[in-house]
From Swiss-Prot:
Lineage: Bacteria, Pseudomonadati, Pseudomonadota, Betaproteobacteria, Burkholderiales
Pfam families with a match to the protein in the record: RBFA
Assembly and binders: Monomer. Binds 30S ribosomal subunits, but not 50S ribosomal subunits or 70S ribosomes.
Record-given protein name: Ribosome-binding factor A
Gene Ontology terms for molecular function: ribosomal small subunit binding
Family: Belongs to the RbfA family.
InterPro entries, per database record: KH_dom-like_a/b, RbfA, RbfA_dom_sf
Localization in the cell: Cytoplasm
Keywords: Cytoplasm, Ribosome biogenesis
Function of the molecule: One of several proteins that assist in the late maturation steps of the functional core of the 30S ribosomal subunit. Associates with free 30S ribosomal subunits (but not with 30S subunits that are part of 70S ribosomes or polysomes). Required for efficient processing of 16S rRNA. May interact with the 5'-terminal helix region of 16S rRNA.
PANTHER family to which the protein is assigned, alphabetical: RIBOSOME-BINDING FACTOR A, CHLOROPLASTIC-RELATED
Length: 122
């Protein structure tokens, strides 16, 4: 029988702390010109804290270039997390561009198009 974790929300708390610390590290210490104004949208940590998927959005600049730059700076950012987090291990960071906003805009456009065509039919 599997033992229940005494702190079931620990993974969420660690992910939340990583999100806050990464936001600060990227804004203040990362000097790569390819990384513009980045917003860390969410962090997903594996149960063993070995890997973390970081989803981000970019206000200005090319998302693909920014993703490459962030993945190249993952070691530097992980080192910064070592100094800030009070955990035994710090996960390996994997950055992914969050396409949720683009998908939402596309869906809104499709809905608006369907509503306008339905209004013309009536």
């Amino acid at each position: 029988m599997r033992k229940k974790s005494s702190t079931p929300n620990r993974g969420f708390r660690v992910a939340d702390q990583i999100q806050r610390d990464l936001t600060e590290l990227i804004a203040r210490e990362l000097k790569d010109p390819r990384v513009g104004m980045v917003t860390v949208q969410s962090v997903e940590v594996t149960p063993d804290y070995a890997h973390a998927k970081i989803y981000f959005s970019v206000l200005v600049g090319d998302p693909k270039e920014c993703e490459i730059a962030l993945n190249q700076a993952a070691g530097f950012l992980r080192n910064g997390l070592f100094k800030r987090l009070m955990t035994h291990t710090v996960p390996t960071l994997h950055f992914h561009f969050d396409q949720t906003t683009e998908r939402a805009a596309d869906l809104n456009a499709l809905i608006a198009k369907a509503v306008s065509s339905r209004a013309q039919d009536d």
